[in-house]
């Protein structure tokens, strides 16, 4: 039989009697002879046409004539690329489509599986589906098994035959009803009812149907490409779409998985992304430096806006899609690694048939379960050891599955529970994700309400501790203050120190708002401080959101603990939330819905406020307007989320390295004796090991109060300076400046400066006392802090972490093949020495050079040596970095261009000097920039190789600790 006139045609011979060996000739080019493959020896995923077309999801077979199905054993078919714009009506043979409906893997020794060809037209019928038997290893990750089957037409089981007839005519290992029902759900979930099939993106995307596929995107997704087109001028949004789609189309599943990890901020993906963009995209229009961030942002926007496109792009296991969406969503829950949500694929092939329930319209149950009693109306349930009575339609109960319907979308994970659910949206689960058209609810409960009988007879009744509700108009954050009915024990997971950083500090280091969620266990009864101290700390970081009127948990009567500082302190922080203030906060958050997301994420407690003078201005100016703009809304010494992304995503700093102790005199997490307080001393939020007399410590101290929400009485947080003998002595030193800020409930940031009265004292500690009802219930002490008044007294930067980024991988600047390298270094403290006036450019002044953001101090004792310009300027001690190549080449990178050697000036051109990772105020000619007191960055043209790198201050003879074997 001849091939059809198409570039992609195949011929399949069906022999009902002899099925051991079936030959499939494949032809991609009419000029080349067809190639033959035997299913007995060739796995399906190695056939050429399966590399281009996902046979399980996007291949439809079109017969040459209807007689071929009934009178002949050999039929001629050709594949149709399923997807909008891919179906052609040019051939009259398209009148009798035959669709590949299902795949089921046998578990017998032969490991054969059958592909059933069943006509989807009611006019054509066959006595039994033709089958293809193949010796194919069962692999759950193979595309043929994991890819769902999508049908845009009415299910054939409702057109041709009844369920009983199906079961008689189907092969033994062929189960249509379960898969067909799931295929319909998947269509509704991804919004693919208008698309004929929803196949693999590799089959859907082509230059011919690219325009149609792009037009089928949502307006939000199109806007993403328009934004990218503006960044890649003069490229149009459709060209950007084609570039990205072609790029993703050529990736392997492993590479796509790495991209998914990159979107979820998981490490070790930089090399792949850089390689792909450097080779596949036009570097001139799509710079490789920004390529990773652009693709990352693009995927985040698309995932959040257009589920259908994500389905086309990542036709992997459905749990990958959900995991990708959950991790990228701004409102995703952040949980400890040991308690992370575990979601399975929606259409996961269940090998244990003893745990499947199929319920049809007539309440016909085919159950192989143990201890299952189900009364369902039009339901499809998969329950484990549950007794459920459900009286609503479209409720799907199964472990780790996702159901998304227009009306009722319930996702229940019931373990050894007896539940009576008589209304919609009743959830009693361990891990559940409910996606409604109006409400998105994420529930997270740890070992709660096991082996209990619960009756839920009202709408929206939840029995768990943490609720995170996202409506289309309102965002609500709940704390359930009620305990289980039978007072069952609540097990709170114990967090290790390394988990504390990932759970507690992302809101400080990443600058997302912080909320320490308390584990309420009191039955509306006041707890004693002793009971509070015994409770374990379980911080779950969420985005503080607005309370809606539909909240089943009314939190108006919940009193938020007050933080009160003693009258003798200069700064007092009192937090009291009343009903009126809650209403004001709701109005403010409603106004913020149209504002940039980063503005909404900034805690109100650290936002800049208008001065009283401006508020009382009567000169006709608008109240609240000011020309002066705050440099940053974040506390000094804490990096912004943009810069954290630069450190981690662009330069490759790992969380393990950023979690190391910054002040060497203490641990990275310092815990109090009773466990109520903790200090953070990591590279992201360091505690300075050295301070100058009278100068502000830019790093400050971050204090956390554990179980802060459990306290029902006033709390007082006192701070004092103590000596090495653990004594308080005001004759030796005192606070010059002190300010305690509440970043979020339970998270405090302490800014300070100290005066040293006794010059013989070299060391000091800061002690924090937590007072409840007039009694000190806990105290904690900072690591040792040393007084250093001049740069010559300061130690050289120690324990420096250094990472590099080659800005242009394919360009060299000299005969030694020097490349443009950007450096970022992190240490406990970097001193910025004053550059003498005679050495500076005329456009910059000594004051300007020493006023960079995050600068810890200048040379000299206190403010006396840096304020007046009339005094004779002392010799400065600026920072410098020495790079020594293994070949003997040495380069000194000075703080200012005026300090560079004449033969090395060409290595610091102006375009490199001006390039910094974040916009900061800097003097012209500065090579080393100080975005923070513990972070420096600089650029230079250096040859590749192995280096020994040393950080030190000029004219300071103290020993430095170099970094050995650093490869550029």
From Swiss-Prot:
Protein species of origin: Dictyostelium discoideum (Social amoeba)
Record-given protein name: Uncharacterized protein DDB_G0289917
Residue spans of biased composition, Low complexity class: 158-177, 352-431, 572-593, 841-857
One Gene Ontology term from the biological process aspect of the record: Rho protein signal transduction
UniProt-annotated stretches for the region Disordered: 124-177, 348-437, 572-595, 608-627, 837-877
InterPro entries: PKHG5/7
Top-rank taxon: Eukaryota
Ranges of Polar residues composition bias in the record: 131-157
């Amino acid at each position: 039989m001849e091939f059809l006139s198409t570039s992609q045609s195949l011929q399949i011979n069906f022999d009902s009697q002899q099925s051991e060996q079936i030959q499939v000739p494949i032809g991609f080019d009419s000029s080349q002879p067809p190639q033959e493959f035997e299913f007995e020896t060739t796995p399906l995923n190695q056939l050429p046409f399966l590399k281009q077309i996902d046979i399980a999801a996007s291949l439809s077979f079109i017969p040459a004539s209807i007689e071929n199905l009934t009178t002949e054993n050999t039929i001629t078919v050709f594949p149709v690329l399923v997807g909008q714009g891919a179906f052609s009506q040019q051939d009259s043979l398209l009148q009798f489509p035959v669709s590949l409906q299902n795949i089921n893997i046998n578990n017998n020794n032969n490991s054969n599986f059958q592909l059933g060809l069943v006509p989807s037209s009611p006019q054509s019928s066959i006595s039994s589906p033709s089958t293809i038997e193949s010796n194919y290893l069962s692999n759950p990750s193979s595309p043929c098994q994991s890819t769902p089957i999508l049908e845009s037409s009415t299910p054939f089981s409702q057109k041709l035959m009844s369920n009983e007839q199906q079961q008689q005519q189907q092969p033994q290992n062929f189960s249509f009803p379960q898969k067909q029902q799931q295929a319909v759900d998947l269509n509704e979930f991804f919004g693919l009812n208008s698309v004929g099939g929803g196949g693999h993106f590799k089959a859907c995307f082509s230059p011919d149907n690219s325009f149609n596929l792009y037009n089928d995107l949502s307006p939000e997704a199109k806007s993403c490409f328009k934004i990218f087109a503006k960044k890649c001028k003069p490229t149009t949004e459709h060209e950007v779409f084609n570039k990205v789609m072609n790029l993703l189309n050529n990736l392997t599943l492993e590479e796509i998985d790495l991209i998914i990890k990159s979107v979820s901020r998981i490490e070790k993906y930089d090399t792949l992304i850089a390689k792909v963009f450097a080779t596949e995209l036009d570097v001139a229009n799509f710079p490789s430096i920004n390529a990773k961030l652009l693709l990352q942002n693009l995927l985040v926007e698309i995932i959040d806006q257009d589920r259908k496109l994500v389905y086309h792009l990542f036709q992997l296991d459905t749990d990958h899609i959900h995991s990708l969406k959950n991790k990228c969503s701004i409102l995703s829950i952040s949980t400890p690694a040991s308690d992370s949500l575990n979601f399975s694929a929606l259409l996961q092939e269940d090998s244990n048939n003893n745990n499947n329930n199929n319920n049809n319209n007539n309440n016909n149950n085919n159950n192989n379960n143990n201890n299952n009693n189900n009364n369902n109306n039009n339901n499809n349930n998969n329950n484990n050891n549950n007794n459920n009575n459900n009286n609503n339609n479209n409720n799907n109960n199964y472990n780790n599955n996702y159901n998304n319907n227009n009306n009722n979308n319930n996702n229940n994970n019931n373990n050894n529970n007896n539940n009576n659910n008589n209304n919609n949206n009743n959830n009693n689960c361990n891990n559940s994700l409910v996606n409604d058209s109006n409400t998105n609810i994420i529930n997270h409960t740890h070992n709660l309400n096991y082996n209990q009988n619960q009756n839920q007879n009202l709408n929206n009744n939840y029995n768990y501790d943490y609720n995170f509700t996202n409506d289309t108009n309102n965002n609500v954050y709940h704390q359930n203050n009620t305990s289980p009915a039978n007072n069952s024990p609540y097990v709170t997971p114990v967090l290790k120190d390394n988990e504390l950083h990932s759970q507690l500090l992302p809101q400080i280091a990443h600058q997302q708002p912080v909320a320490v969620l308390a584990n309420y266990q009191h039955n509306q009864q006041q707890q004693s401080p002793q009971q509070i101290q015994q409770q374990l700390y379980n911080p779950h970081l969420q985005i503080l959101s607005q309370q809606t009127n539909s909240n089943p948990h009314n939190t108006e009567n919940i009193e938020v603990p007050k933080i009160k500082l003693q009258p003798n302190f200069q700064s007092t922080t009192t937090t009291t939330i009343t009903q009126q203030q809650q209403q004001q906060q709701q109005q403010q958050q409603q106004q913020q819905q149209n504002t940039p997301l980063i503005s909404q994420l900034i805690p109100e407690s650290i936002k800049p406020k208008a001065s009283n003078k401006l508020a009382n201005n009567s000169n006709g100016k608008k109240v609240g307007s000011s020309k002066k703009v705050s440099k940053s809304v974040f506390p000094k010494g804490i990096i912004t989320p943009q810069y954290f992304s630069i450190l981690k995503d662009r330069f490759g700093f790992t969380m393990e390295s950023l979690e190391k102790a910054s002040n060497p005199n203490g641990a990275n997490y310092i815990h109090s004796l009773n466990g109520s307080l903790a200090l953070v001393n990591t590279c992201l939020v360091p505690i300075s090991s050295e301070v100058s007399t009278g100068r502000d410590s830019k790093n400050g101290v971050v204090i956390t109060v554990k179980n802060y929400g459990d306290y029902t009485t006033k709390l007082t947080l006192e701070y004092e300076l103590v000596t090495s003998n653990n004594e308080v002595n005001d004759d030796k030193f005192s606070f010059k400046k002190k300010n305690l800020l509440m970043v979020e409930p339970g998270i405090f940031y302490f800014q300070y400066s100290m005066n040293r009265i006794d010059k013989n004292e070299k060391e000091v500690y800061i002690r924090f006392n937590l007072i409840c009802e007039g009694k000190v219930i806990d105290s904690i002490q900072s690591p040792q802090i040393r007084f250093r008044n001049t740069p010559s007294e300061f130690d050289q930067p120690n324990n420096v972490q250094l990472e590099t980024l080659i800005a242009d991988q394919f360009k060299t600047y000299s005969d030694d093949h020097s490349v443009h390298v950007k450096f970022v270094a992190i240490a406990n403290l970097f001193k910025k020495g004053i550059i003498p006036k005679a050495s500076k450019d005329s456009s910059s002044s000594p004051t300007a050079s020493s006023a960079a953001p995050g600068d810890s101090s200048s040379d000299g004792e206190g403010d006396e040596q840096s304020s007046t310009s009339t005094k004779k300027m002392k010799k400065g001690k600026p920072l410098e970095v020495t790079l020594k190549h293994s070949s003997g080449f040495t380069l000194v990178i000075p703080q200012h261009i005026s300090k560079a050697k004449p033969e090395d000036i060409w290595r610091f051109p102006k375009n490199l000097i001006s390039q910094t990772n974040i916009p900061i105020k800097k003097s012209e000619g500065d090579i080393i920039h100080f975005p923070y007191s513990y972070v420096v960055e600089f650029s230079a043209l250096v040859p590749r190789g192995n280096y020994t790198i040393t950080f030190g201050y000029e004219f300071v003879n103290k020993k430095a600790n170099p970094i050995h074997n650093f490869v550029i």
